[in-house]
Regions:
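Active-site mouth loops of central-metabolism enzymes
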Residues: 36-58, 111-121, 170-172
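Alpha-helix-loop-beta-strand connector modules within alpha/beta enzyme cores
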Residues: 34, 82-109
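Glycine-rich, proline-tolerant flexible connector loops at the mouths of alpha/beta enzymes
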Residues: 44, 69-91
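Conserved, mostly hydrophobic/aromatic
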Residues: 56, 63, 74, 138
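Hydrophobic faces of well-ordered beta-strands that scaffold small-molecule active sites
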Residues: 32-36, 71-73, 105-111, 136-140
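Conserved anion-binding
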Residues: 116, 128-181
């Protein structure tokens, strides 16, 4: 197995020792990725998380200037920034604006790729809304996830959620869906 590894950095002390002795020129290339904002949670948990498109674009520029080669993008509902969105037009807009300012920054849109189940158990459409925006990378979540997610109250001046909400998340991707995506 080790013959197939580009580098084995499971032992952190080995990694630090190699870096200390040889410097960066002896290390394998790395891609620094910055996840701009969370998929479900936002400024209610960390005021530094950008939610609006303008703020995310600026954060992408700042990350690029700090050395990031890739940004991971989630979009928010412009009428309620406390809610995630799967609007393909929002992904297209943010990608276009980031590319205008940082043409060689790799854009990684979240895609999930699977389906969510409604309260009646019926599966929805494939979650691939970000793909028409033509990101260089799209994150696909290969898993089955049945969980509860706590959406925290958004304190003033944030709007969109006046109290904590517990929501159920039922997500699944099967072999056929993964092959289609």
């Amino acid at each position: 197995m080790e013959n197939y590894l580009v580098g084995d950095y499971r032992d952190a002390s080995y990694y630090v020792d190699k870096l200390y002795r040889g410097g960066l020129e002896n290390m394998h290339p790395a891609i620094i990725t910055c996840a701009l904002t969370g998929s479900f949670h936002g400024a209610e948990l960390n005021p530094n998380l950008p939610e609006a498109i303008d703020a995310q674009v600026q954060q992408a520029v700042d990350a690029y200037n700090a050395g990031a080669a890739m940004v991971h993008i989630h979009v928010r509902n412009p009428q309620n920034l406390g809610e995630p969105s799967s609007d393909p037009e929002l992904f297209a807009e943010i990608n276009r604006r980031i590319r205008e300012k940082c043409p060689d920054l790799i854009i990684n849109n979240t895609a999930m790729g699977g389906r969510t189940a409604g309260p009646d158990g019926r599966l929805g459409d494939l979650m691939v809304a970000s793909l028409p925006a033509r990101p260089e990378v799209a994150s696909i979540d290969v898993m089955a996830n049945y969980t509860k997610i706590l959406f925290k109250k958004r304190p003033a001046p944030l709007t969109g959620r006046d109290q904590d909400e517990m929501r159920r998340m039922h997500y699944v991707i099967d072999h056929d869906d993964a092959m289609e995506v």
